[in-house]
């Protein structure tokens, strides 16, 4: 209906601000929907398809490759943790690393990531301004770790700002965006028919495209009884956002508890109590005898 209407989006950030983020969590091939969403935005807001032609021709010569990393989440966030080491350890004999940030958040991890880049550019959350700022760096490759998690970087990704534009599984779904060329994943994360799930060319690496540092363990580690569990409890922690737990996963959790009578499942509390109640209702249908061994942590 939107494609057939005569409506125009003068500013998709204000007029729509939808990225299709939640599609990744219903266990279906979303390629048609992702491409349709992108098509609607391009039809209704043609300026999204900005192309900096004079800066998107591969640079000739024998200098370093100029690689840009662009995300809202380069701070103490999952994305910051996944890509901190990746940015730090790229061979500087081959690559010049330019970091593009859309968040003003400054914490210890944000400072570390910035220190590991050769240049840092703080982008205004204005599409035209950001398009010009990124394209002016004459990149050889632009890497978006997490298209779809933040609406501004999602809409910016519609532009052609570098000869090669890449995303990865910071958000585990195809963008459907024509100007994103490659989706970098891992062999162990993709099914045999995975290519058909992406509008991008799927690249299967041997290992995930991250460099993850071991988390620092805080002092004063807690014992099971600190969480109201028996002292001999076997603790299974699943610290994932509750809406990401697909019903197909319920039986796996149930089997773990059924096969380990001392097992206790710890989950992170949701933003709303109703999320926990809905999840418990699901669990009761799948593993009712072990439901009393499920605990939500505040």
Stretches found by the model and what they are:
Residues 94-96, 254-292:
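A conserved nucleotide-sugar
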Residues 13-18, 232, 257-263:
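Short acidic (Asp/Glu) and glycine-rich catalytic loops that position anionic groups and cofactors
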Residues 65-72, 230-246, 250, 254:
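Conserved donor-binding/catalytic core segment of Leloir-type glycosyltransferases
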Residues 80-81, 110, 247-250, 276-277:
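Conserved strand-to-helix beginnings and helix N-cap segments that scaffold or border functional pockets
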Residues 74-77, 122-123, 240-245, 267-274, ...:
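Short, contiguous acidic/charged loop-to-helix segments that flank catalytic cores in large enzymes
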Residues 1-229, 281-289:
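Alpha-helical solenoid repeat scaffolds of the TPR/TPR-like class and their adjacent stem/linker regions
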Residues 69-71, 98-101, 143-146, 237-240, ...:
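Short beta-strand segments
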Residues 1, 294-298:
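Short, intrinsically disordered, charge-balanced linker/junction segments flanking boundaries
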């Amino acid at each position: 209906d939107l494609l057939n209407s005569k409506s125009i989006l003068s500013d998709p950030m204000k007029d729509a601000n939808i990225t299709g983020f939640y599609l990744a969590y219903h266990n279906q091939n979303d390629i048609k929907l992702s491409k349709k969403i992108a098509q609607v935005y391009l039809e209704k807001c043609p300026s999204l398809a900005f192309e900096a032609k004079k800066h998107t021709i591969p640079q000739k010569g024998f200098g370093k490759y100029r690689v840009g990393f662009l995300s809202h989440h380069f701070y103490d966030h999952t994305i910051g943790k996944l890509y901190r080491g990746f940015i730090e350890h790229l061979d500087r004999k081959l690559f010049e690393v330019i970091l593009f940030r859309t968040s003003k958040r400054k914490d210890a991890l944000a400072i570390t990531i910035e220190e590991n880049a050769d240049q840092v550019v703080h982008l205004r959350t204005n599409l035209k301004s950001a398009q010009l700022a990124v394209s002016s760096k004459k990149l050889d490759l632009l890497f978006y770790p997490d298209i779809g998690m933040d609406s501004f970087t999602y809409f910016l990704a519609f532009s052609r700002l570098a000869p090669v534009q890449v995303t990865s599984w910071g958000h585990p779904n195809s963008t459907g965006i024509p100007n994103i060329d490659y989706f970098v994943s891992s062999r162990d994360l993709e099914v045999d028919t995975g290519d058909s799930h992406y509008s991008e060319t799927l690249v299967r690496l041997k290992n995930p495209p991250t460099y993850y540092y071991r988390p620092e363990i805080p002092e004063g580690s807690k014992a099971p009884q600190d969480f109201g569990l028996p002292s001999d409890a076997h603790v299974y922690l699943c610290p994932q956002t509750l809406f990401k737990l697909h019903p197909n996963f319920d039986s796996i959790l149930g089997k773990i508890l059924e096969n380990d009578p001392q097992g206790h499942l710890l989950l992170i509390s949701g933003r709303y109590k109703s999320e926990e109640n809905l999840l418990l209702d699901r669990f009761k249908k799948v593993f009712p005898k072990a439901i009393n061994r499920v605990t939500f942590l505040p």
